[in-house]
């Protein structure tokens, strides 16, 4: 299935690229999410007419993400939980916990924008957590987990 991308998608293409995707991926994810349209003659003509407006919207989204990244660049989060003597937490620190801690510092970050490489944090220590604000804007935020 050929689709026209309406925004940049990692490992697939940029705005305006005509790419071949699996039918289920296009039909069930890209098209309903508004990330792509089916590549037929009519949609190609419509896209050519709307391309400048779409590029402007994408540039604004990138600028907003860069501004959020600049504000988050020096953010450090401290989360205190009960832990055993060996440093293992009674529970874990997940996406929602980190998102809530960032919100307490005044940074609105959705839990879907946070990437934990090895799953939830289950030990005391400091951990870099990847925050994915835009396909072109990612940064690491340090999370310090300490004993309560």
Swiss-Prot record:
PROSITE patterns: RIBOSOMAL_L9. Disulfide bonds: none annotated. Signal peptide: none annotated. Gene3D superfamilies: Ribosomal protein L9, C-terminal domain (3.10.430.100), Ribosomal protein L9, N-terminal domain (3.40.5.10). GO terms for molecular function: rRNA binding; structural constituent of ribosome. Keywords: Ribonucleoprotein, Ribosomal protein, RNA-binding, rRNA-binding. One of its GO terms (biological process) is translation. InterPro entries: Ribosomal_bL9, Ribosomal_bL9/RNase_H1_N, Ribosomal_bL9_bac/chp, Ribosomal_bL9_C, Ribosomal_bL9_C_sf, Ribosomal_bL9_N, Ribosomal_bL9_N_sf. It holds the Pfam family Ribosomal_L9_N. The keyword Kinase does not apply. GO terms for cellular component: ribonucleoprotein complex; ribosome. The keyword Heme does not apply. Binds to the 23S rRNA. Belongs to the bacterial ribosomal protein bL9 family. HAMAP family: Ribosomal_bL9. NCBIfam families: L9 (TIGR00158). This is Large ribosomal subunit protein bL9. It comes from Acidithiobacillus ferrooxidans (strain ATCC 23270 / DSM 14882 / CIP 104768 / NCIMB 8455). The gene is rplI.
